[in-house]
Amino acid sequence: LRGAKPTAALESSVARSLELAPGETLVVAVSGGPDSIALGALAARAAPAADARVVLAHVNHGVRPRAWQDEAVVIALGTALAQTANVRVAVRTLGPGSPDEARLRDGRYAALLEIARETGATRIATAHHARDQTETVLLALFRGTGPTGLAGIAPERELAPGVHLVRPLLRVDPLALRAYCSAHHHAYALDATNVDTSLRRNAVRALLDGVRPQFPGLDEAVARCAEIARDERERRPRAELRARLRDQLGDALGETSDVSFERIDALARALEAGRTGRHFVRRGVEAIVEKRNP
């Protein structure tokens, strides 16, 4: 990860993952750690080409005594990035509250959603990376998970109507993110609790760090497994929907042997996404998807 080439490759990869729309406002959750600092900088790097705006959203939970340092590095990043891109910083202070991780996460997402609503953003990007994915899948395995747990962290999910969470760094190693921060002189804060192995995720992280030298492709392998599990989970309901559609078309048309899989699959995807309109089924036959009144 030396020199300009790895930096440029990372910028191109993240820009492709983000796929910023022209004029879009993207909220980036920035805790102040190296991963989210890098994501904020990478998003700002991609923004001008799409005439997009980036909002660096920082949530101060009021739990950690040195939380002011996290906020300071986020504000400093926003100031630096605003010189070359349309970037602003939004800070929310929630504390003091419960140190329970689930409650902190819920409060953080609620604050991020509020910022998205205020700024007109439809997407919130978080800095979950490849090692986060590995830890999540392994924790799920230790709990005796099924296919849902094996799917790990989703690259995208709906947080609320009209607002989606996106994770453009899920295939990126955090060492590359730290190298990016160093190459561009972006300061970041470190959370001392990340080395407390009394916490389950930290214990799993320490375990994985011990075996990575023997399994150098570990994170890529787990990422592939998670992707396969997600595909299988999503494919099953769609397969059932395709079967129902073929049965219904058979009832209506009498014969469906000349209706291609691709036509039925496209119709199934349209129904899943709630897209209305006409869909070609076969010569002289169209299926019309309409919005049903409640």
Describe each region flagged by the PLM.
Residues 49, 53, 84, 110, ...:
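Generic macromolecular interface patches on structured domains
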Residues 1-140, 175-176:
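ATP-dependent adenylation/nucleotidyltransferase module used to activate substrates
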Residues 98-103, 200-202, 289-291:
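Short, solvent-exposed polar/charged micro-motifs at secondary-structure junctions
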Residues 2-35, 47, 52-55, 61, ...:
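AMP-forming adenylation/ATP pyrophosphatase catalytic core
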Residues 63-68, 195-198, 275:
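Acidic, metal-coordinating catalytic cores used for nucleic-acid/nucleotide bond scission
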Residues 105, 170, 197, 279-280:
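Residues that recognize and position ribonucleotide moieties
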Residues 123, 129-272:
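Flexible helical/loop "lid" subdomain adjacent to adenine-nucleotide binding pockets
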Residues 69, 180, 203-204, 279-282:
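Surface-exposed beta-strand edges and their flanking turn/coil or helix-capping segments
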